[in-house]
Amino acid sequence: MDVTDVIEPAEQLSLETAGCRNVSPVLNRVGDKWSVLIVMILADGPRRFNELKRHIDGISQRMLTLTLRGLERDGLVSRTVEPTVPPRVTYALTELGESLKEPVEALGRWAMAHIDCIRAAQQRFDARG
């Protein structure tokens, strides 16, 4: 017998709400536009900070720093400092970050396949005033 078979509906809703609450911060991180772009770039291999900044149009130095720190905190990106002068800092996907490549690529493919439909829907919505 499955545990959900013996849980009352109100309890089930409570468990689902708790699950959403637990997953929400993770989805906020991996669903953030800058995080997605960083994961896509690092999927091709390790990069230095300025390389990432050059590849991501419109991101400020502060936002790149904050996003990388968040990804590092969540275990998705590693930061390696080489003891050179000046210090060389390299960012790479961790094993956990590597596991995010496929879903991010799938999301990108979906977006590219449906961009025309989405733009048309936006235009219809905006035309309503």
Roles of regions detected by a PLM:
Residues 2-8, 101-129:
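Amphipathic alpha-helical dimerization/coiled-coil segments
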Residues 3-7, 15, 93:
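Loop-helix junctions at membrane interfaces
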